[in-house]
């Protein structure tokens, strides 16, 4: 399936029929997901959808189910270009099933710091690996007829103050690290759309940044397509239009109201020709997607395709990385475990399949690790489960033992125009839960009152947790027991379930009925509310005293002691690792509970295995106390099956780390410069400024600088174990022309089972200079081998990959001399080196 060829005459014909006012209206969304249409003028709409690991459709939470694919950090861990392309192809099917033709993906920003809240959505700390995988993802997506939207252009490496943070990045670091994955993917796969980032880059917001949009994207790279803002990420009228932002999303517009744009056109700040150019790019996207011939937006459907289930399971297992396997405790063979007991601890009954935010998906189903292992090992193995640790960030919503004002299960929500909920409400609804998320709501009320009658089944001093976008209070039998007196300090955290809530206790008597109310008012408008500005919102969590104070750790240790194997499933739920917030700790949540669980179980059972589901590196203070560790990332809806496949040996692990795992957060290259420092602005507000002081020395480029730095790495970039062993021989490299280098190495599987090795090629000057990395990834290949089999891996890379940007000359430059080609199985495990001589080169961007 290919895109329609654009007929310039058709575009100009449609454009000529539109008034200036209508052209302006085309430059902002009609609603949250669709573009503006003018059916009477022959202009159809097009629908967009999140996101990188599943086409969610128009509903942020709930809604029509969709396939949930592995997160991009897992996809990167496969080091498999074909896998990335297949995921893209399948996502195109999913996107169409939601009536959309534009998928808001992939995300290719760099893993600058392990605490980056959105790292899991992106591929790697290495721009070459990220760019290559993104290019194949886009080829798969667009080859199947759906437009890709590469994002977030550029340098969206943190979530803290993401709408306003000013990032100071040298031009060299910007070009070599942060723009490079975009450049590779755009030049190799030509995505139809680019989404700008929220942040400020060197003093100018990305959506109005002439250097990024005009000079580099459309100028140097020659890209022709549609540039859209991130949702709520437009920050100006004239500047963004002139810089090249074609489409403000979502609608209704905040910055492109017709009268306001007409005013800047009349003043000469924006030329009418610029409006035409922006509108033309919108129309060309519609033409490429066949919207003119087929303007209908179909209803959303849930299509649970068996081929997608198989793909998700396969790619999920390929991306799992075996970090430790002492004494070959893995794989867990069925014949060995017959009549044995296996302890399943931690998140064994919860499938951690995705991170939070726009990557959230209402999956068709979720396979838990327990379900996957029971299916794989059968009834001959005895399993025993214990939770082991409290990991909640917020108390679960209060939905048990409550009835609304009509006596039905749930809550009554009354909405009022005024901030005081007096008199008759303007609207009332019934809700299963005491929560109101206003993201897709058109009406902006002054206040909301949630009411229910609660009859506890247990006496005790039970716990509440509450938050609201604006001032809020909790009442029991008319008495205020807690009051939030200010706006929520983190509106995105509220939206995505990551805002910190105080815990309030209240004594209840079993069998007695209590009137529970929450009153929340519209927040005082301020910077930072973004899409939630002017809307009410609240949530109320609850947990009994018995459950809250339960000694889960002792229960888990007892189970581990009486088991032959103990498997601890650790990780991040979507409210701990999410868009909108950077993580609060390098340690697993919450408050050290998971670290204590692993350490205690490791001490109780000598055969302890840890399976960690996070999208990022985490601290592992218990590493020496366990036999095996598997990094499982976020594997998608088949999580439990993919994990079981690797644990039982049905699949030989072949994943390799796309990021470095530091020993401590202080060892991260960006430590001390993340998320930045606050300064007082002229507008009497605090502004976050961050300087990328590490320059080009991101990830392994930093650790490679010295032995002292290398000692700070727990697991290096490119690392991963297998159930078999591979050897390399006959390392060769030669410059076949002035522009290319060919590398070859013989790979042999000397073990007893089939597997896949990832051959990695790094290159750098033999005589390294302090301002340049020692070596950088320039190529890779995944080689599948049967026991005893040998294959030759052939990898070609371009000489210009070795150039560095010189700010003084404004050119990419390569000095003549000897260069070392390092071939290996990780950035640290180099199996052979070959020297080649190269001539000097330089070229303009």
UniProtKB/Swiss-Prot annotation:
Q: In which pathway does it act?
A: Glycan metabolism; cellulose degradation
| Domain PA14 intervals | 406-557
What domain of life?
Eukaryota
Task: List all annotated glycosylation positions.
Answer: 202, 235, 591, 612, 794
Residues annotated as the enzyme's active site: 230
Which keywords does the record carry?
Carbohydrate metabolism, Cellulose degradation, Glycoprotein, Glycosidase, Hydrolase, Polysaccharide degradation
List the SUPFAM superfamilies hit by this protein, alphabetically.
(Trans)glycosidases, Beta-D-glucan exohydrolase, C-terminal domain
Pfam families annotated for this entry? Fn3-like, Glyco_hydro_3, Glyco_hydro_3_C
Sequence intervals crossing the membrane: none
Its EC number is: 3.2.1.21
Q: Name one GO biological process term.
A: cellulose catabolic process
In what way does activity depend on pH? Answer: Optimum pH is 5.5.
InterPro entries given for it?
Cellulose_deg_GH3, Fn3-like, Glyco_hydro_3_AS, Glyco_hydro_3_C, Glyco_hydro_3_C_sf, Glyco_hydro_3_N, Glyco_hydro_3_N_sf, Glycoside_hydrolase_SF
Q: Which reaction does it catalyse?
A: Hydrolysis of terminal, non-reducing beta-D-glucosyl residues with release of beta-D-glucose
- How temperature affects activity? Optimum temperature is 52 degrees Celsius.
Annotated GO MF terms: beta-glucosidase activity
> What biological function has been recorded for the protein in this entry?
Beta-glucosidases are one of a number of cellulolytic enzymes involved in the degradation of cellulosic biomass. Catalyzes the last step releasing glucose from the inhibitory cellobiose.
Q: Which family does it belong to?
A: Belongs to the glycosyl hydrolase 3 family.
**Protein name in the entry:** Beta-glucosidase B
């Amino acid at each position: 399936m290919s895109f329609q060829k654009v007929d310039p005459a058709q575009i100009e014909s449609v454009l000529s029929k539109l008034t200036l006012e209508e052209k302006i209206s085309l430059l902002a969304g009609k609603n949250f997901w669709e573009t503006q249409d003018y059916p009477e003028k022959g202009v159809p709409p097009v629908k967009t959808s999140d996101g990188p690991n599943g086409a969610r459709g128009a509903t942020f939470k709930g809604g029509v189910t969709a396939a949930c694919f592995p997160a991009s950090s897992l996809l990167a861990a496969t080091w498999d270009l074909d896998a990335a392309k297949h995921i893209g192809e399948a996502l195109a099917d999913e996107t169409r099933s939601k009536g959309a033709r534009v998928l808001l993906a992939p995300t290719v920003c760099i893993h600058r710091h392990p605490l980056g809240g959105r790292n899991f959505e992106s591929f790697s700390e290495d721009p070459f690996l990220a760019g290559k995988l993104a290019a194949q993802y886009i080829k798969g997506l667009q080859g199947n007829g759906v437009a890709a939207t590469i994002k977030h252009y550029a340098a969206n490496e943190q979530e803290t103050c993401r709408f306003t943070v000013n990032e100071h990045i040298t031009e060299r670091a910007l070009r070599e690290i942060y723009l490079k994955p975009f450049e590779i993917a755009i030049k190799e796969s030509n995505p139809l759309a680019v989404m700008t980032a929220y942040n400020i880059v060197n003093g100018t917001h990305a959506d109005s940044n002439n250097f990024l949009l005009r000079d580099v994207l459309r100028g140097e790279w020659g890209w022709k397509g549609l540039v859209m803002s991130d949702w709520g990420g437009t920050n100006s009228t004239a500047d963004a239009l002139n810089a090249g932002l074609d489409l403000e999303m979502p609608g209704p517009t905040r910055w492109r109201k017709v009268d306001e744009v007409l005013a800047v056109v009349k003043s000469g700040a924006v030329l009418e020709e610029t409006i035409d150019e922006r509108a033309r790019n919108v129309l060309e996207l519609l033409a490429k997607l066949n919207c003119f011939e087929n303007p209908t937006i179909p209803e959303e459907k849930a299509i649970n395709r068996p081929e997608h289930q198989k793909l998700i399971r396969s790619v999920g297992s390929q991306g799992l990385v075996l970090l430790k396997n002492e004494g070959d405790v893995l794989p867990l063979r069925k014949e060995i475990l017959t009549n044995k007991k296996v302890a399943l601890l931690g998140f064994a009954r919860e499938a951690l399949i995705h991170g939070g935010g726009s990557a959230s998906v209402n999956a068709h189903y979720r396979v838990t690790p327990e379900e996957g292992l029971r299916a794989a090992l059968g009834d001959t193995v005895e399993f025993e489960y214990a939770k082991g640790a409290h990991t909640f960030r917020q108390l679960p919503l209060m939905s048990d033992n409550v009835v609304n004002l009509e006596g039905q299960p749930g809550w009554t929500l009354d909405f009022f125009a005024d901030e005081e909920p007096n008199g008759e409400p303007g609207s009332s609804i019934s809700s299963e839960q005491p929560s109101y998320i206003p993201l897709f709501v058109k009406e902006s009320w002054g206040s909301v009152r949630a009411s229910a009658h609660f009859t506890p089944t247990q006496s005790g001093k039970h716990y509440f947790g509450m938050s609201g976008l604006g001032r809020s209070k909790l009442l029991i039998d008319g008495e205020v027991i807690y009051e939030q007196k200010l706006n929520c300090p983190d509106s995105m955290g509220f939206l995505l379930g990551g805002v910190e809530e105080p815990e309030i206790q209240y004594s209840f008597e079993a069998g007695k009925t209590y009137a529970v109310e929450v009153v929340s008012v519209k927040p005082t408008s301020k910077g930072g509310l973004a899409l939630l500005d002017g809307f009410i919102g609240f949530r109320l969590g609850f947990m009994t005293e018995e459950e809250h104070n339960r000694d889960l750790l002792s229960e888990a240790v007892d189970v581990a002691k009486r088991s032959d194997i103990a498997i601890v499933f650790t990780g991040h739920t979507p409210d701990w690792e999410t868009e909108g917030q950077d993580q609060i700790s390098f340690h697993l949540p919450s408050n050290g509970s998971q670290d204590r669980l692993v350490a205690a179980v490791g001490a109780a059972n000598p055969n302890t295995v840890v399976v960690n589901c996070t999208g990022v590196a985490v601290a592992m203070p218990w590493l020496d106390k366990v036999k095996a560790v598997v990094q499982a990332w976020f594997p998608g809806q088949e999580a439990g099956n993919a994990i079981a496949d690797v644990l039982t040996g049905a699949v030989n692990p072949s994943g390799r780390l796309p990021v470095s795992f530091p020993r401590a957060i202080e060892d991260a290259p960006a430590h001390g410069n993340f998320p930045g420092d606050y300064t007082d602005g002229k507008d009497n507000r605090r502004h976050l400024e961050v300087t990328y002081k590490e320059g080009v020395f991101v990830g392994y480029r930093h650790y490679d600088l010295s032995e002292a730095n290398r000692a700070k790495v727990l697991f290096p970039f490119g690392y991963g174990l297998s159930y078999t062993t591979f050897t390399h021989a006959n390392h060769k490299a030669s410059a076949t022309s002035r522009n290319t280098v060919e590398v070859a190495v013989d790979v042999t599987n000397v073990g007893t089972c089939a597997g896949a090795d990832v051959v990695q090629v790094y290159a750098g000057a033999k005589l390294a200079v302090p301002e340049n990395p020692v070596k950088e990834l320039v190529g890779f290949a995944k080689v599948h081998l049967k026991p005893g089999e040998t294959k030759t891996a052939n990898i070609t890379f371009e000489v210009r990959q070795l150039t560095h940007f010189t700010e003084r000359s404004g050119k990419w430059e390569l000095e003549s001399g000897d260069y070392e080609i390092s071939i290996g199985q990780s950035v640290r495990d180099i199996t052979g080196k070959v020297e080649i001589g190269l001539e000097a080169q330089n070229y303009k961007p």
